[in-house]
Amino acid sequence: MNCDPDVTECVTFPAVSPDNQLTRAFMQLSHYRFSIAWPRLMPDGTKASLNQKGLDHYNKVINALLAAGVTPMATLYHWDLPQTLQDKGGWPNPELADLFNDYARVCFKEFGDRVRTLTSC
């Protein structure tokens, strides 16, 4: 499995469409929580590296859930810090608070119209 930031195969469910068997199974759920991978949206952890393929992927996931009548709930951080930020010291680095704020704002802007619950671990 290729888990590069611009590849969508490394995900909870590999193909999202109304015909997908897993998507149909979600119809029995009222809510579904999934993680948005910071490295997928911003591979180097900054707005400058915003990855359109990553945005498209999560829009597809969210739209498929909504089409199935399932309320999406997204976790913004679930232990997947971009490697470049880990290399700069990880969370103890004071710059990370501002970078996470930028990432969270992008998520709210891009997905907040459809995802009403965004959390972090």
Question: Which stretches of residues belong to each language-model region?
Answer:
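Short catalytic helix/loop segments, enriched in acidic residues and glycine
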Residues: 1, 9-19
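Substrate-binding cleft and catalytic face of glycoside hydrolase catalytic domains
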Residues: 2-5, 22-121
